[in-house]
């Protein structure tokens, strides 16, 4: 058979294999191509720059943040500030380590573990915001914060372990390039399922105020909470669409998930800061999760008397006697400026016969003697 093929001047082609999107493409080259002759990848540099800038911003705001934290009794703000700080540090560490590792198998595993650690912290903050906002936002106590963090830690750890196991033990061959296995977020199928799940969760949060459920439970009234949920719902929707295209072996989907991955791992921590911490570290700290609109109390009615009546009352006091006038003057200088009108009226009442302020008080002295 082989001789027949050689005689015909042709060779036997191997059977067609499944379409692999690891063929050179701009969206794929971005993930693993190095800058010049260095081992620094464009992808790692793109993720490093926003995290470094945000970390510098946090350091710049650190003196003000420490001063605000000292005078606050809310553990929610302290917890969120620490978590945002940690996420920025982990993002920087992941990018720096990825820049220094080689293309060996051990280095690839280390890089994927750093990706999972970063994802773990980001997901923990995601779940903490949702749980605190919907269930425990009105309980700003250390015990409630610890319970929320414990729940989010367990859930985030389970998610990250599952994703890491799929990524390391069962890497997606469609997300590999040359001799370097690119981090694939657990594979196309896992990426699609998780993106759809989080899209449904955040979409439900956004529409909650429009449902009859708002009459039965207390929902956050801050607009920034729902803007935060809406942004993440949109991000997960785009990520799900990109993953679906990858499952259909359409390489354009890789460009979509590249964009969503960059936005999530670079700007999620700043999103948390702007949505929930900027008001706290501003000039006037605001409540993180408010559950009803604050109604200002009605202004106190002006207790001071009209000017004509006040003049007439003053003349009556002066005619009543010097002692009573002295008491009125004392009242005016001590209390009028402070707005305590009730004490002013008592002290400036006309003096009656037999009162302590009248001239008949001499008989009280005789009795006491």
Swiss-Prot record:
Q: Which domain of life is it from?
A: Eukaryota
**What membrane topology does this protein have?**
Multi-pass membrane protein
Task: Tell me the InterPro entries matching this sequence.
Answer: TPRA1/CAND2/CAND8
Q: Which residues are glycosylated?
A: 20, 329
Q: Name one GO molecular function term.
A: G protein-coupled receptor activity
Q: What induces it?
A: Decreased throughout ischemic hypoxia and reoxygenation.
> Which key words tag this protein in UniProt?
Glycoprotein, Membrane, Transmembrane, Transmembrane helix
Biological process (GO) annotations? embryonic cleavage; G protein-coupled receptor signaling pathway; negative regulation of mitotic cell cycle phase transition
Q: Does the keyword Aminoacyl-tRNA synthetase apply?
A: no
Q: What is this protein called?
A: Transmembrane protein adipocyte-associated 1
Which organism encodes this protein?
A: Rattus norvegicus (Rat)
């Amino acid at each position: 058979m082989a001789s027949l093929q050689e005689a015909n001047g042709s060779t036997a082609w191997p059977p067609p294999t499944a379409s692999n999107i690891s063929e050179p493409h701009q969206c794929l080259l971005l993930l693993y191509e190095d800058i010049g002759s260095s081992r620094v990848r464009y992808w790692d540099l793109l993720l490093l720059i926003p995290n470094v800038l945000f970390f510098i911003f946090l350091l710049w705001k650190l003196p003000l943040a420490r001063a605000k934290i000292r005078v606050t009794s809310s553990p929610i703000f302290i917890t969120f500030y620490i978590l945002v700080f940690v996420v920025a540090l982990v993002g920087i560490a992941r990018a720096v380590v990825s820049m220094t590792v080689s293309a060996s198998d051990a280095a690839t595993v280390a890089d994927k573990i750093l990706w999972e650690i970063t994802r773990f912290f980001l997901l923990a903050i995601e779940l903490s915001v949702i749980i605190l906002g919907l269930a425990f936002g009105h309980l700003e106590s250390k015990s409630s914060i610890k319970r929320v963090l414990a729940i989010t830690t367990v859930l985030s750890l389970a998610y990250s372990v599952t994703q890491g196991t799929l990524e390391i033990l069962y890497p997606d061959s469609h997300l590999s390039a040359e001799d370097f296995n690119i981090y694939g977020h657990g594979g196309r199928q896992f990426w699609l399922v998780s993106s759809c799940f989080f899209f449904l969760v955040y979409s439900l949060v956004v529409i909650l105020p429009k449902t009859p459920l708002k009459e039965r439970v207390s929902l956050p009234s801050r607009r920034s909470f729902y803007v935060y949920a809406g942004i993440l719902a949109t991000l997960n929707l785009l990520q799900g669409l990109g993953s679906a295209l990858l499952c259909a072996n359409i390489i354009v989907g890789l460009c979509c998930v590249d964009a969503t991955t960059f936005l999530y791992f670079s700007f999620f921590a700043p999103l948390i800061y702007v949505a929930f911490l900027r008001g706290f570290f501003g000039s006037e700290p605001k409540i993180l999760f408010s559950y009803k609109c604050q109604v200002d109390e009605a202004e106190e009615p002006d207790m001071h008397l009209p000017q004509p009546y006040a003049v007439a009352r003053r003349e009556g006091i002066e005619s009543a006697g010097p002692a009573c006038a002295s008491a009125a003057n004392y009242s005016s200088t001590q209390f009028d400026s402070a707005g305590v009108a009730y004490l002013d009226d008592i002290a400036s009442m006309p003096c009656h016969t037999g009162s302590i302020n009248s001239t008949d008080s001499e008989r009280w002295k005789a009795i006491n003697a």
